[in-house]
Amino acid sequence: MSNNMLRMVAAVAVWTVFAAGTAIAAGKGEATYEKDVRKIVSENCLSCHGNDAPTMEAFKKDQEGFKKTMKGPRMDTYANLMIMVNGSDTGALMRRLDDGKSTKEGKPGNMYTYLGKTEAEKAANLTVFKEWVGGWTLKRQKEITEGELKAIKALEK
């Protein structure tokens, strides 16, 4: 790939991330599940995390079995998604969607790759999720502080 082509790809990626963040910050108000997140989940996640997927409770009982059938915990509703944001599996959504910039190893979460078809789309969708969550943390329920929990916005409407 030529230097000019690389510059063009980088410029498009930066512009996409900037535009996504700006659209949320200006004019649209705070990011919400209904307005911003639901569409991303529908387009990128529901083939494995839809209404035919197991509840979190059922998934925990047979994770390997469900993984073999390409089924993860159900994310088809706001309530089901919130289990992985600040519920019984606090931080799971953030750990799995993170691009690796929140870890010392720099390794993206195992579901980051499904956030979009291109790096620019993945980055833009991650920006939306981060704005929606607010207090983006990779900590588990037993590790998270009260202040960090309060920083999680994750508005439904």
What function would you assign to each model-found segment?
Residues 18-25:
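Sec/Tat signal peptide C-region and signal peptidase I cleavage site
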Residues 25-157:
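Aromatic- and Gly/Pro-enriched helix-to-coil junctions and flexible linker segments
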Residues 1-12:
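Bacterial N-terminal signal peptides that target proteins for export
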